[in-house]
Amino acid sequence: RMREEELKRTGGLTPEVRAILEKGSEYIESIRKSNDAIPGEEVSEKIYRMELLVRRIFQQTEAHPENARDLRKMMDYYLPMTVKLLGAYEELDRQPVQGENILNSKKEIEDTLDTLNSAFAKLLDNLFEDTAWDVSSDISVLQTMLAQEGLMEDGLKK
């Protein structure tokens, strides 16, 4: 009974899910601050896309808290490493002389941002898997019912 009241009061989110969402907000803020600190337009676009993807992942998790368990690697490894790499990029970018090692490291980080963005996009897409199954199932049932009632034209059948 008390657990039900607690869940109702917190929007149906368990303390674990709330903690994930709060930590997620901190990561998003950190990503944004790095983006503000890094002037390069091309790398800034990559970071902006990352912020958008990560924000959507957490929005989807808030709407569907059962997805929180799928974020463990993202929370424990991918996001901390992302923040670390962005911090390193900021430091490298601030150097007055951009020598070969600095340029190579920055390029490597930029390429890794592309990889991370692809991974975050795939993770976001995976969070919609159950929704996609539900939609397909609902459409299939609807088409069957319409066909049984003789309400479906041949052009609408798959």
Predicted regions mapped to residue ranges:
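Membrane-proximal, non-transmembrane interface segments of integral membrane proteins
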Residues: 1-62
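Soluble C-terminal extramembrane regulatory/interaction domains of multi-pass membrane proteins
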Residues: 45-158
